[in-house]
Regions:
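N-terminal accessory segments that target, anchor, or regulate ATP-driven/P-loop NTPase machines
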Residues: 1-156, 339-342, 350, 361-365, ...
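Conserved catalytic network of the ASCE P-loop NTPase/AAA+ motor domain
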Residues: 16, 59-62, 87-91, 184-188, ...
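The start of beta-strands in P-loop NTPase/AAA+ ATPase cores
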Residues: 23, 263-264, 331
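Short gly/ser/thr-rich secondary-structure transition/capping motifs
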Residues: 48-52, 245-250, 287-292
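Conserved AAA+/SF3 P-loop NTPase catalytic/coupling segment centered on the Walker-B
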Residues: 77, 229-236, 253-287, 303-306, ...
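Flexible nucleotide-interacting loop at or near the entrance of a catalytic core
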Residues: 125-198, 396
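Nucleotide-binding/hydrolysis machinery
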Residues: 156-176, 180-183, 187, 206, ...
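Conserved post-Walker A coupling segment in P-loop NTPases
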Residues: 167, 177-242, 246-248, 259-264, ...
C-alpha cells in the first residue's frame, strides 16, 4: 500500500502480560551487561525496573510496548523491525525506537530506503546521538506510540505513468497529525484546502497524500509560478480548457479542472491567485462551475482543489483583495518547518548520504557526520527546509569525498554548504511561511 494510513486498532490491541517490561532494549553484547546503561534508561521510564536489555537476534520475542534499538548496526536491524512488525500485525501498537550515532547515518539511510520500498517501515521513531547519555536525554520524548506508517511513497513525476517512485519520510508526530487531519478531510467531504509551509517543506507530498486518501480520479498539478498569470486567456485555457476554434487555429483542450475529475487539482504557488487568475477562479470557487474558453455551456467542478503557498498567512492577507481571497474558502493545513522535526531531519540526512554514496566509483563515500557536523545541522534554521538541507549535504559530501577527507563529514564542510545554500540572513526569509 502506498502512503500513510494503516492504523492499529486500539480496541483490538491486547494488553501486555503482567511480566512484560515497558521497554525492551536491543543492543550490542558489549552494552548488554553494563549496569550503568540499565540505570540511565530506567530513570526515564514511568516505573522502576521496567527495562529489559537483550542482544538482538532473529528469534527475538517482543512483548513490550516499546523497543529501543541502541547503536545496533543498521544492517542488522531487520530481525528487530520484523519482530516489531509481527507484533503490530497481531493488533498491538508496539513502537520501535532506532537510536544510532552520527557515524551510522549512511547505513541507516540504506535501511530506511529498503524498508520503505518494501512497505515495511511503520511505527518507528528515530534518535541520533553519539553516546548512551545523549540517547537517554531524548528517550522520554520518543515514548509515545506510533499508529501511522513512516513514509508517503509517491511518483517522482505524479502525472506521468510508470515513473519511478520516491519516499517522503514521516517520523515527526506533527506530520502524523497532519496526515490524520487530511485523512479526515477526505472522509468527510472537504474538497478544498490550503497547504501552508516554507519552501521545500513537503507541501506537494501532502497534496499527493490528499489524493491518495481520496482514492479516485487523477492528481493534476498547476504551478502558477511557471505560468503567465497576467494573461487571462492563457489561465482560463489552462484551468478551464477551451473548445475547438476558440481562437484561430485552436484545437480542443481539456483544462486542469476536467482532467482532475473526481481527483485533486493541486494549485501550487497560489500566492499568485490575484488579478486574471482570481477572475478565472471566482465563479468556479463561488458556484462550483466554470466556462471553458470559447464554450457556450458551463461545466461543474467535480474535483477537490488544494492550494499551496510558501508565503505566511499574514503575508497572503496583506497582499491580496480580502474579499476575493475569502472566496477560496479553504481549510488551512500547515506543514511544520524542518527545524522543528528532528526525526525527519535525521531521515533526510541518512537517505541523502546513502544515495550520494551509492554513486561513488573512485571516491570513498563518507559514512556519516562528525558530532560537530550534526550539531551544525541541528542548530540551523533551515528556511529552505528539506530542499536546502539536501543541497547543503550534497555540497559537503562533494567537498569531503573529492578531497579524500575521511569517513565523516566535518563541521567546516557543513558550514560552508550552509553559507552557500542556507544563508542566515536573506530578504526572502520574511515572506515565507513559518508553520
Amino acid at each position: 500500500m502506498l502512503g500513510l494510513g494503516k492504523k492499529v486498532s486500539r480496541e483490538a490491541e491486547a494488553a501486555p502480560s503482567a511480566s512484560a517490561a515497558f521497554l525492551q532494549v536491543v543492543t550490542p553484547t558489549l552494552l548488554q551487561a553494563d549496569a550503568d546503561v540499565r540505570a540511565l534508561i530506567d530513570r526515564q521510564l514511568p516505573a522502576p525496573n521496567q527495562c529489559q536489555i537483550v542482544a538482538g537476534s532473529a528469534a527475538l520475542r517482543i512483548e513490550s510496548p516499546f523497543v529501543l534499538s541502541l547503536f545496533v548496526d543498521p544492517s542488522s536491524l531487520d530481525p528487530i523491525a520484523d519482530a516489531v512488525l509481527r507484533r503490530r500485525q497481531a493488533g498491538h501498537a508496539t513502537t520501535l525506537i532506532v537510536a544510532i550515532n552520527p557515524t551510522q547515518l549512511a547505513a541507516l539511510g540504506r535501511w530506511l530506503e529498503a524498508r520503505a520500498n518494501a512497505s515495511t517501515l511503520v511505527g518507528t521513531r528515530l534518535i541520533l546521538a553519539p553516546t548512551v547519555d545523549g540517547v537517554v536525554r531524548q528517550l522520554a520524548d520518543r515514548l509515545a506510540q506510533v499508529t501511522e506508517d513512516n513514509v508517503i511513497r509517491m511518483p517522482v513525476s505524479p502525472e506521468i505513468e510508470n515513473t519511478d517512485y520516491k519516499n517522503f519520510f514521516v517520523f515527526n508526530p506533527q506530520l502524523h497529525r497532519l496526515a490524520a487531519r487530511i485523512r479526515g478531510f477526505t472522509q468527510n467531504g472537504i474538497s478544498r484546502a490550503y497547504l501552508l509551509g516554507g519552501p521545500g517543506s513537503g507541501k506537494t507530498s501532502f497534496a499527493f497524500y490528499f489524493w491518495l486518501m481520496r482514492n479516485k480520479g487523477r492528481f493534476v498539478s498547476v504551478n502558477l509560478a511557471a505560468e503567465s498569470t497576467g494573461d487571462k486567456a492563457a489561465i482560463k485555457s489552462l484551468l478551464c480548457g477551451h473548445v475547438s476554434g476558440a481562437f484561430p487555429g485552436a484545437g480542443a483542450r481539456t483544462g486542469a479542472f476536467l482532467h482532475a475529475r473526481d481527483g485533486v487539482c493541486f494549485i501550487d504557488e497560489s500566492h499568485g491567485v490575484t488579478g486574471p487568475v482570481m477572475e478565472v477562479l471566482m465563479e468556479a470557487l463561488d458556484n462550483g462551475q466554470y466556462l471553458p474558453f470559447g464554450a457556450s455551456a458551463k461545466q461543474p467542478i467535480q474535483c477537490a482543489i488544494v492550494f499551496a503557498s510558501n508565503r505566511s498567512w499574514e503575508h497572503l492577507q496583506s497582499a491580496v483583495n480580502l474579499d476575493e481571497f475569502t472566496r477560496m474558502g479553504a481549510a488551512i493545513l500547515e506543514v511544520p518547518e524542518l527545524h522543528k522535526r528532528e526525526e525527519d531531519m535525521i531521515a533526510v540526512v541518512a537517505t541523502t548520504l546513502a544515495r550520494l554514496g551509492q554513486r561513488c566509483s573512485t571516491w570513498t563515500a563518507p559514512l556519516g557526520l562528525s558530532e560537530a557536523g550534526w550539531k551544525a545541522i541541528r542548530e540551523c534554521r533551515w528556511h529552505g527546509n528539506v530542499r536546502a538541507l539536501v543541497r547543503v549535504l550534497e555540497a559537503a559530501f562533494v567537498d569531503t569525498a573529492s578531497a579524500g577527507g575521511g569517513e565523516l563529514i566535518q563541521a567546516d564542510e557543513i558550514e560552508h554548504g550552509i553559507a552557500l545554500w542556507e544563508p542566515k540572513a536573506h530578504h526572502s526569509h520574511q515572506i515565507y511561511a513559518a508553520a
